[in-house]
């Protein structure tokens, strides 16, 4: 009997949660013909935030994350201010016949004011978005142009897709 009340309480309390630092996209496609790519970050909080950003690999088979440099890796973003995170190629070789994918992590760390004898719980929100490097050899190609290379199949109650194209594909309804 108490589980429905817990679920209702959780739903009501979640409406008050918000991220202070908002990233300006769900993915960043790095054009191989350019030297860098930029994504915006905005502080929607009433206090300053420290913004920390870094790259991580998608899986063990991913190219090394040191193929890029994030600048600035750590900076202060005042209340209501917009900033930019720039991703720059380091010169390390990446495959030029297919896309490479990494995770771009952008964490907003809110400022706190020390108040003696008061307990405070505070969360730092980490936004994890896709960084897709599209080599110069694939410039102008779109996922739609490679749709016929997808192999669709059925396994019991699920649908499987094998991607034989050099591009990463995203699906939505």
Residue ranges and their predicted role:
Residues 148, 153-173:
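Intrinsically disordered, low-complexity segments enriched in serine, threonine, and glycine
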Residues 62-94:
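Intrinsically disordered, low-complexity Pro/Gly/Ser/Thr-rich segments with frequent PxxP/GP/PP motifs
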Residues 19-40, 141-154:
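Beta-sheet-dominated interaction scaffolds and their linkers
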Residues 13-16:
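N-terminal signal peptide c-region/cleavage motif recognized by signal peptidases
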Residues 92-138:
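Terminal connector regions
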């Amino acid at each position: 009997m108490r589980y429905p009340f817990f679920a209702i309480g959780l739903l009501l309390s979640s409406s008050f949660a918000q991220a202070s630092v908002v990233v300006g996209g769900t993915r960043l496609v790095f054009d191989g013909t350019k030297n860098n790519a930029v994504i915006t970050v905005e502080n929607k909080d009433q206090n300053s935030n420290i913004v920390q950003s870094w790259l991580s690999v998608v899986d063990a088979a991913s190219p090394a994350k040191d193929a890029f440099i994030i600048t600035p890796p750590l900076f202060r973003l005042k209340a209501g201010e917009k900033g930019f995170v720039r991703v720059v190629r380091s010169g390390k070789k990446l495959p030029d016949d297919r896309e490479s994918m990494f995770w771009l992590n952008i964490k907003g760390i809110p400022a706190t004011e020390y108040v003696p004898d008061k307990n405070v719980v505070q969360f730092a929100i980490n936004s994890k978005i896709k960084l897709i490097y599209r080599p110069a050899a694939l410039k102008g190609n779109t996922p739609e142009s490679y749709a016929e290379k997808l192999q669709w199949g059925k396994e019991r109650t699920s649908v499987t897709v094998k991607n034989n194209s050099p591009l990463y594909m995203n699906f939505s309804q």
